[in-house]
Amino acid sequence: MTEPRLKIALTKGRVEQQVLPLLEEAGLDCSQVRNKQRRLIFDSETQPYEFILAKGPDVTTFLERGAADIGIVGSDILTEHESTQYELLDLGVGKCQFVLASTADFDPVAPRRKIIGTKYPLITQRYFDRLGQDVEIIKIEGSVELAPLTGLADAIVDITETGTTIRENHLQIYDYLQPVSTRLVVNRLALKQQQAAIFDLVDRLATVVDTNNPKEFV
């Protein structure tokens, strides 16, 4: 009987580049993905895995609809899209922070209603709800940093790894909302049907993650 393939939806781009070495250290054959050319679906010739390369939001859709068994995607996408699938592992890469940023003259506690530009309206709304502040949120798909510089918004909520882009655009950080990293999530039905194979993969990846991110003992 042929062993069923685990379908792994992997966020293409930077997440893909950071995660492929982890998958390879865990023993997965990723040669087809590395030599992808223009393809987006890859079968391992030697192992029961199939890789699907997709944009982050689409990874969650593949999982929700059962088109993928495992998804590898940023926690920002999972939170913004309110994913209901099981999160099994923090892969320890793609580490960033959600920040509130604006120009030097921005007053974060001013009582007036603020306009906030962001790619993440749900996360932004929840943040200001916790603060008890009423804001207008404008969804921006491109360079969010432009919003306060052009007067489109008073401030922005965005992801930053080092803060360099924010500083280069003459903005400053006023608050840190929450950390972000790349997570491994699993379709609920797949976890029931292929539990042994999924947990075997998760265990191997967890060993790699622990090796690459040793804990500090005080």
Swiss-Prot record:
<keyword id="KW-0547">Nucleotide-binding</keyword>
<comment type="pathway">
    <text>Amino-acid biosynthesis; L-histidine biosynthesis; L-histidine from 5-phospho-alpha-D-ribose 1-diphosphate: step 1/9.</text>
</comment>
<protein>
    <recommendedName>
        <fullName>ATP phosphoribosyltransferase</fullName>
        <ecNumber>2.4.2.17</ecNumber>
    </recommendedName>
</protein>
<dbReference type="InterPro" id="IPR024893">
    <property type="entry name" value="ATP_PRibTrfase_HisG_short"/>
</dbReference>
<dbReference type="GO" id="GO:0005524">
    <property type="term" value="F:ATP binding"/>
</dbReference>
<comment type="similarity">
    <text>Belongs to the ATP phosphoribosyltransferase family. Short subfamily.</text>
</comment>
<comment type="function">
    <text>Catalyzes the condensation of ATP and 5-phosphoribose 1-diphosphate to form N'-(5'-phosphoribosyl)-ATP (PR-ATP). Has a crucial role in the pathway because the rate of histidine biosynthesis seems to be controlled primarily by regulation of HisG enzymatic activity.</text>
</comment>
<dbReference type="GO" id="GO:0005737">
    <property type="term" value="C:cytoplasm"/>
</dbReference>
<comment type="subunit">
    <text>Heteromultimer composed of HisG and HisZ subunits.</text>
</comment>
<dbReference type="GO" id="GO:0003879">
    <property type="term" value="F:ATP phosphoribosyltransferase activity"/>
</dbReference>
<dbReference type="GO" id="GO:0000105">
    <property type="term" value="P:L-histidine biosynthetic process"/>
</dbReference>
<keyword id="KW-0067">ATP-binding</keyword>
<keyword id="KW-0028">Amino-acid biosynthesis</keyword>
<keyword id="KW-0368">Histidine biosynthesis</keyword>
<dbReference type="InterPro" id="IPR013820">
    <property type="entry name" value="ATP_PRibTrfase_cat"/>
</dbReference>
<dbReference type="InterPro" id="IPR018198">
    <property type="entry name" value="ATP_PRibTrfase_CS"/>
</dbReference>
<dbReference type="InterPro" id="IPR001348">
    <property type="entry name" value="ATP_PRibTrfase_HisG"/>
</dbReference>
<keyword id="KW-0963">Cytoplasm</keyword>
<dbReference type="Pfam" id="PF01634">
    <property type="entry name" value="HisG"/>
</dbReference>
<keyword id="KW-0328">Glycosyltransferase</keyword>
<keyword id="KW-0808">Transferase</keyword>
